[in-house]
Design a protein with these regions (language model features):
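Lipid interaction determinants
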Residues: 34-93, 99, 104-223, 227-280
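Hydrophobic helical h-region of N-terminal Sec-dependent signal peptides
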Residues: 10, 14, 18-26
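N-terminal secretory signal peptides that target proteins for export/translocation
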Residues: 1-10
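Terminal processing/anchoring signals of secreted or surface-associated proteins
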Residues: 1, 32-33
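C-terminal motif of bacterial Sec signal peptides marking the signal peptidase cleavage site
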Residues: 27-31
Length: 280
């Protein structure tokens, strides 16, 4: 009887130990899962904060505009000299991606000729996260405190990268293959070589399903397709049928879109929401 009792007690203790061990494993897995979820939430916040805003990097000159459609635009300088000469700004177009806590920025084309885009933020930054900031600026009569967080990471050489938020871009672009920033009908004045003294009204209507209706009054009227990726649009019939063209693009305040050459970064054309404005 005593043997049976001891045997039963032993089996019970072993069962309890197994349950406790299982509980410890479950608790450990739950803790890891919770930690991973928090990390993913923080990285989602970084991405949401980054896209749609203009940024400066450390103490370097120029601004980096990160768009929701994954285009990145760099701008610096420009203006007029005291003598009235135009100083052309440095401009570059590229794309950005986030993979975990790594932010990659790559520039593909810049202007003017001779502007070295390799000197820009053109690499992968690791360990990207948000960091509190209290930047104080002011004068004798007023003080301003910028409490917006920094985006901080590590360059490939081990140095720290600090990105400070500037202006909002009023960005309505998105990551889809048919970017909402292009959708709708846009108008432009078109010159044709066989009628150099006449300006024709052209229109492009971009639809959500990836089709685009191209019209040049009295000259062209056809439907084609388009796709968008990383701030570039490929139109499988631009101005004339079967002429495939790819551009960087910007939607400015919903009133116009600008198309930029992927070869040299210069503006190719402007298309306006208001048809009457094409003659201004």
């Amino acid at each position: 009887m005593k043997k049976n009792f001891l045997s039963m007690m032993k089996r019970s203790l072993m069962a309890i130990s197994a349950v406790v061990a299982m509980g410890m494993v479950t608790a450990s897995l739950t803790a890891c899962s919770s930690s991973d979820d928090e990390s993913e939430k923080e990285l989602a916040k970084v991405k949401e904060y980054l896209a749609g805003n203009e940024w400066t990097v450390n103490s370097t000159r120029g601004t980096y505009s990160y768009y929701k459609n994954h285009m990145v635009l760099y701008e610096n300088g420009g203006g007029l000299t005291p003598g009235g000469y135009v100083i052309e700004p440095d401009v570059a177009f590229g794309y950005w991606q986030m993979d975990g806590d790594k932010l990659t920025t790559r520039f593909e084309v810049g202007r003017p000729e001779g502007f070295n885009i390799k000197n820009l933020l053109n690499e992968t930054i690791s360990e990207v996260h948000l960091q509190e900031s209290n930047k104080i600026t002011g004068s004798r009569v007023s003080v301003s405190i910028d409490m917006r967080p920094l985006i901080v990471g590590t360059f490939a050489n081990g140095n720290e990268c600090q990105m400070r938020c500037g202006s909002s871009l009023n960005d309505i672009s998105d990551e889809t293959e048919h970017d909402g920033a292009l959708r709708g009908t846009w108008y432009s004045g078109i010159s044709i070589s066989d009628s150099p003294d006449k300006t024709y009204v052209g229109s492009m209507t971009f639809n959500e399903d990836g089709t685009m209706h191209m019209v040049i009054e009295g000259k062209q009227d056809f439907t084609t397709t388009y796709s968008t990726r990383n701030g570039k649009v490929t139109i499988n019939g631009y101005l004339v049928k079967d002429h495939v063209a790819t551009f960087y693009y910007q939607n400015l305040y919903g009133s116009l879109i600008k198309l930029y050459s992927c070869e040299n970064g210069y503006m190719s054309s402007i298309w306006r929401k208001n048809k009457e404005e094409i003659y201004q």
